[in-house]
Design a protein with these regions (language model features):
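Alpha/beta enzyme core
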Residues: 3-10, 18, 27-36, 42-330
Length: 330
C-alpha cells in the first residue's frame, strides 16, 4: 500500500535538495556486474578495424583478444559476447561456415577459454545470419525462412560452440521450438550445465542496421525478417514467446532492441521473475553517439539510457558502452 501525504506537510523536493540525499535514496544504479560486452571478430592478424556506422566500436583479430578480455576482467565485467565478421567468400545459402570448427568464433572460444578458464563468461550467438549469403537467420526457400529445417542446423552449431567452450548459448534466430530442441541436444551430449540465454523477444526492427554492417550482412539481406522476428506493434505476443521458451528450458531471456521496448522488459520481469537481459542495440548506440558528436546532447544521455534498462527490470545489459562504464559514471 502506498502511503500518501499532503502539501505543505509533504514536500518531495526535500529528499532531492542535496547530492548526498539523492544518492541515499536512489532506487537504481549501475555496476560492472550489469553488463555484457559485445566483441566483433575479424580474420587476419594484428588488426583493429573501425566500424564506420558505430564510432568507437571495432572489429578485432583473434590475436588482439587478450588485451580486450584482460581489460574486461579488470573492470569486473562478468561476460563477453562474440560476433563474427564473415568474409563473403565463406558465406553460402546454407550458412555452412557456422559448422566449421575452425571458424572465427570457434578459434576465439578456444583461445579465450585456454587462457582465462572461468574468469569470465562467454556468450555466443546461435543463428545463421552471419554465415548465409542471403543474410537471413535460417534456410531460405521462396523468400520464407524454413523453421524445422533451420533448427537441425542450429543444433549442430550449438553443440559445436559448447564443445569449444561457450558458457552461454544465445539463440537469436527466432525459430519456433528451437530452445527445447537445443536443450535436449545439449543434454544428450553431456552439456547439461551449458546455459541458454534465449532471444525470446526479438523484434523485426530498423535499429539493427549498424550491427549488420559490423558483421558484414547489411548489403546481403534479401527481403525482411518479419515472418520470423516479432511485430513491434505487439506486446502480448512477447509474453507468449517468453512463456514457451521458459517451458522449453531457457535459463535467461533477452529483449531486443532495448530502449524502444522498456515496456516489454517490465512486463516480462513482472510476469515471469526470470533473469531478463536487454540489448542496447547498434542503432541505439549510434544514435546516441551521433547526438553527442553533433552537440545535440551531452554524454550524460548515455547513463540516463542505461539506467532506464535497470529501472524497467533488466538484470543485465548488452551494451557497446560496457567497458567504458568508469568514464560514464563520474
Amino acid at each position: 500500500m502506498m502511503i500518501t501525504g499532503k502539501f505543505p506537510s509533504l514536500r518531495l523536493r526535500r529528499n532531492r535538495k542535496t547530492d548526498w540525499s539523492r544518492r541515499l535514496i536512489e532506487e537504481n544504479n549501475l555496476t560492472p556486474n550489469d553488463f555484457i560486452l559485445p566483441i566483433f571478430l575479424i580474420d587476419g592478424k594484428n588488426k583493429k578495424q573501425s566500424i564506420k556506422s558505430m564510432p568507437g566500436v571495432y572489429r578485432y583479430t583473434i590475436d588482439k583478444l587478450n588485451n580486450i578480455v584482460d581489460r574486461a576482467i579488470k573492470k569486473g565485467i562478468p561476460m563477453i559476447a562474440l560476433f563474427p565478421y564473415t568474409e563473403k567468400r565463406k558465406k553460402n545459402d546454407l550458412g555452412t561456415e557456422a559448422l566449421n570448427e575452425n571458424n572465427l568464433v570457434c578459434r576465439a572460444l578456444q583461445r579465450i577459454k585456454n587462457k582465462y578458464k572461468n574468469e569470465i563468461g562467454i556468450m555466443c550467438d546461435v543463428a545463421l545470419d552471419p554465415y548465409t549469403s542471403h543474410g537471413h537467420d535460417g534456410l531460405l526457400q521462396n523468400k520464407y525462412v524454413l523453421n524445422d529445417e533451420t533448427i537441425k542446423i542450429l543444433l549442430d552449431q550449438s553443440l559445436l560452440q559448447a564443445q569449444m567452450g561457450c558458457d552461454v548459448l544465445a539463440p537469436s534466430d527466432m525459430m519456433d521450438g528451437r530452445i527445447g530442441e537445443i536443450r535436449k541436444y545439449l543434454d544428450k551430449h553431456n552439456f547439461k550445465m551449458t546455459q541458454i540465454l534465449s532471444y525470446a523477444v526479438k523484434y523485426a526492427s530498423s535499429f539493427y542496421g549498424p550491427f549488420r554492417d559490423a558483421v558484414g550482412s547489411k548489403n546481403l539481406l534479401k527481403g525482411s525478417k518479419k515472418n520470423y522476428q516479432m511485430d513491434y506493434r505487439n506486446s502480448d505476443e512477447a509474453l507468449r514467446e517468453v512463456a514457451l521458451d521458459i517451458k522449453e528450458g531457457a535459463d535467461m531471456v533477452m529483449v531486443k532492441p532495448g530502449l524502444p521496448y522498456l515496456d516489454i522488459i517490465k512486463k516480462v520481469k513482472e510476469n515471469f521473475k526470470i533473469p531478463v537481459m536487454a540489448y542496447q542495440v547498434s542503432g541505439e548506440y549510434s544514435l546516441l553517439e551521433h547526438g553527442i558528436k553533433n552537440d545535440l546532447t551531452d554524454r550524460n544521455i548515455i547513463l540516463e539510457s542505461l539506467i532506464s534498462f535497470k529501472r524497467a527490470g533488466a538484470n543485465a545489459i548488452v551494451s557497446y558502452y560496457a567497458d567504458r562504464l568508469d568514464q560514464i559514471i563520474k
